[in-house]
Design a protein with these regions (language model features):
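A short, acidic/glycine-rich surface segment
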Residues: 20-29, 65, 98
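Core segments of cupin and vicinal oxygen chelate
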Residues: 1-20
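Vicinal oxygen chelate
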Residues: 2-5, 24-98
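Residue-level signal for secondary-structure boundary sites
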Residues: 12, 21, 50-52, 88, ...
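Non-catalytic surface loops within mature trypsin-like serine protease
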Residues: 8, 17, 46-48, 82-84, ...
Length: 98
């Protein structure tokens, strides 16, 4: 599992195989099964310069950037995959009118 602090919140990314199993009868923390099956998608807001830096960082570390484009209404997005196959995106907030 990986946890990211995002401002005042926390983003939790779970190992799907581990969270899909029901807890053992004697589990100290009986967390019920949860999560999704198949690849998911997560988008994180980032400024134009941050996206450029993230793309360089990802590529320097062997992570393939699947797409890098400008939206018709303005704003850039890059897409890549995490080790579990989930689609991750950095996008400028202006794509949502923010």
């Amino acid at each position: 599992h990986v946890f990211f602090r995002c401002g005042t919140g926390i983003l939790l990314l779970f190992n799907a195989e581990a969270t899909r199993r029901p807890p053992a009868p004697d589990a100290r923390l009986p967390v019920p099964p949860h999560g999704a099956q198949g690849p998911g998608h997560l988008c994180l807001a980032a400024g134009a310069e941050e996206i450029t830096r993230w793309k360089a960082h990802l590529e320097a570390n062997g992570v393939a950037v699947e797409a890098d484009f400008l939206w018709p209404g303005g704003g850039r997005s890059i897409y890549f995959r995490d080790p579990s196959g989930n689609s991750l995106e950095f996008a400028e907030p202006k794509i949502w009118g923010l």
